[in-house]
Amino acid sequence: MSGPILVFDSGIGGLSVMNEIRKQLPLHDYCYLFDNARLPYGNLSEQELITGCVALITHHARRLNASIVVVACNTASTLVLPLLRQQLTIPIVGVVPAIKPAAMLSKKKHIGLLATPGTVKRDYTQALINQFAGNCKVELFGTSDLVLLAEQYVAQQQIDMDKLNEILAPIAASNIDVLVLGCTHFPMIATEISHYLGEGVTLLDSGEAVAKRVRFLLSKESNSNKQLQACYTKDIGQGLKAALVDYGFSDFSLVTITD
């Protein structure tokens, strides 16, 4: 397996996961593929999400001769992993909300999950809660607006602090002591979230666990030229492109399923 690590998301949230993978595997080539034309995924029907994601990921994984696919999107991971594994022979890794470590960490046994509406309502999410947090009270907070705020933040745009406060106010009032960031966009604005919620709430995400899994599946480090390629399904603005350059990207492509 010699091709790049293909990291996929609806937008820039998957960069939070890719950053963790690069800490574990710094010498690999990476392609970051994001389907920003259909952002946010939490508002799509299940069939729209499945059809589009599977077609886009499988096509570009084959085109790139990817060594592994990381679906760095919680909403997509709840739906598309089995179909991807049927169509591709390379390893497929998804992200799972950090319910288990949150339940273990919580002293109050009162935790929260902040995710997209799609992730919050999935049977898969409830199964995780039943399996790993049966001894906890679990509060569910669904939002797509926070995805868009994270996109604006990374693109170096002014974010609507009133909207951010509106989203976080019910969480602050809930008396939880651990909050699971169940969307890969949310770690991008973890500092702002933590500032609002205060020191009494610990934030957890799945990035490090995913990175360890990828490292395990890729048995040896690559000796590549460490190229970072960004592919997107809708043109991006100069602010976001500048942010991606700061992340180390040097190759940019507007793509479709058939490119």
Curated annotation (Swiss-Prot):
Pathway: Cell wall biogenesis; peptidoglycan biosynthesis. It catalyses: L-glutamate = D-glutamate. Disulfide bonds: none annotated. Substrate binds at D9, S10, Y41, G42, N74, T75, T184, H185. It comes from the Bacteria. Its EC number is 5.1.1.3. One of its GO terms (molecular function) is glutamate racemase activity. PANTHER family: GLUTAMATE RACEMASE. This is Glutamate racemase. The gene is murI.
